[in-house]
Amino acid sequence: MAKIGVLGAGTWGMALARMLSNSGHEVTVWSALPQEVDELSRTRRQKNLPGMVIPDEIKFTKEIAEACQDKDIILFAVPSVFVRSIAKTAAAFIPDGQIIVDVAKGIEPDTLLTLTEVIADELNKDGKHGNVHYVAMSGPTHAEEVAKDLPTTIVSACEDQAVAKKVQDVFMNKNMRVYTNSDRLGVELCGALKNVIALASGICSGLGYGDNMRAALIIRGMAEIKRLGLKMGGKEDSFDGLAGMGDLIVTATSKESRNNNAGYLIGKGKSAEEAKKEVGMVVEGINAIPAALELADKYDVEMPIVFAVDAVVNRGADARETVDALMLREKKSEMTK
C-alpha cells in the first residue's frame, strides 16, 4: 500500500483518487476551494462525474500540508495555470527525495517550461529540494472513462527508470495499464501541444468538414509537434506512442474532449470565451497557444496548424478562410522535416 496525496479535486484528480483508493492505497485529497472539500466530503460525488461514487476511504482536507507530508507520492492534478502557485504553497511541506507525479498538461507561457519543470523551478528556490523525483503521467486518458473503470493506458515518464517503475507499480491495475518512458520532456510536450491540434479538429467539425480533414489534422498536427519536440530534445518514440499519437487521437476525436468540443463551438461561430463558458471546464488548448507560438519561433519550427488555430481563436480570423489558406499553402513533400 502506498500513501498518496492528491492536489486538486477536479475530474482527473478525483477519477485517479478513486482508482488508487480502490486499489488499496491510502489517498488524501486537497482542494484550494474549502467549499469544494465540504461538498465532496458530504456528497461523495464529483459534480462533473455524476455516475462516480467516491469511496469512503478517501480523506479530504483543506490543509495542503496534510496532503504533502508523509506521502510516498504527491499527485499534481490542477489546471496548468495554477501549478506554479500551488507548488509554491506546497514547497514548505514537501520533503527532499519526494516523488511528485504531474498529470496536468500544459506549458507555462512566461517561462516556456513544462509543468514538471515549473514545479521543480519553484521547489528549487529554497535550495532544499535537490533530490525530488519528477514524473509526468500522460496518455489517452479521459477522466470520464477512468471513473467508469473502462480499460485505459498511460505513460509514467521519468529519467530515473526506477522511479518510473515505482509509479507504474502503484498506478497499474486491471483497468489501468501503465508503461514506463524515460523521455519526460517529450511526453509533456505531447500532452500540452496535442490540445491545440484538438481545437483545430473541433473547429473543422463545427464547419461541417468530414473525417478526411480530421485525419489530416491529426497526422499533420503530430508532424508539427514532433518537429518541435525533436528540436527541443524529445525522443521520436514518444511522439509515436501513447502520450503522443495515442493522446492526440482521443483528444481530437472524442465527444468527451473539452478541447475538441470547444473547437466545435468556435467552428459554429462562437467566440473563444463563449466556447469556454459553454464547455464549463478548463480548455487547456486555448491556454497552450501562446507558448506553442513562442516555442515555434524560438526553435525556428514551421507549425502552420498551430498558427491557424491562433488566428481563429485569438485574432478573429474567419475559420473557413483559414482552412482554405492551409489547403492552398505551397506544395511540399510529406517527408519534409
From Swiss-Prot:
Q: What is this protein called?
A: Glycerol-3-phosphate dehydrogenase [NAD(P)+] 2
* Its biological purpose: Catalyzes the reduction of the glycolytic intermediate dihydroxyacetone phosphate (DHAP) to sn-glycerol 3-phosphate (G3P), the key precursor for phospholipid synthesis.
In this chain, NADPH is annotated as bound at 11-12, 105, 143, 258, 282, 284
Molecular function via GO: glycerol-3-phosphate dehydrogenase [NAD(P)+] activity; NAD binding
What is its subcellular localisation? Answer: Cytoplasm
**Cellular component GO terms held in the UniProt record:** cytosol
- Give the species this sequence originates from: Lactobacillus delbrueckii subsp. bulgaricus (strain ATCC 11842 / DSM 20081 / BCRC 10696 / JCM 1002 / NBRC 13953 / NCIMB 11778 / NCTC 12712 / WDCM 00102 / Lb 14)
Q: Which Pfam families match?
A: NAD_Gly3P_dh_C, NAD_Gly3P_dh_N
Its EC number(s): 1.1.1.94
> Which SUPFAM superfamilies does the entry mention?
6-phosphogluconate dehydrogenase C-terminal domain-like, NAD(P)-binding Rossmann-fold domains
Give the pathway listed in the UniProt entry for this protein. Answer: Membrane lipid metabolism; glycerophospholipid metabolism
Q: Name one GO biological process term.
A: phospholipid biosynthetic process
Signal sequence interval, chain numbering: none
What family, per the record? Belongs to the NAD-dependent glycerol-3-phosphate dehydrogenase family.
> Record keywords: Hydrolase included?
no
Provide this UniProt record's keywords sorted from A to Z: Cytoplasm, Lipid biosynthesis, Lipid metabolism, NAD, NADP, Nucleotide-binding, Oxidoreductase, Phospholipid biosynthesis, Phospholipid metabolism
Q: Which residues form a coiled coil?
A: none
Q: Which positions in this protein are listed as binding sn-glycerol 3-phosphate?
A: 105, 139, 141, 194, 247, 257-259
Q: Which reaction does it catalyse?
A: sn-glycerol 3-phosphate + NAD(+) = dihydroxyacetone phosphate + NADH + H(+); sn-glycerol 3-phosphate + NADP(+) = dihydroxyacetone phosphate + NADPH + H(+)
Q: Which residues form the active site?
A: 194
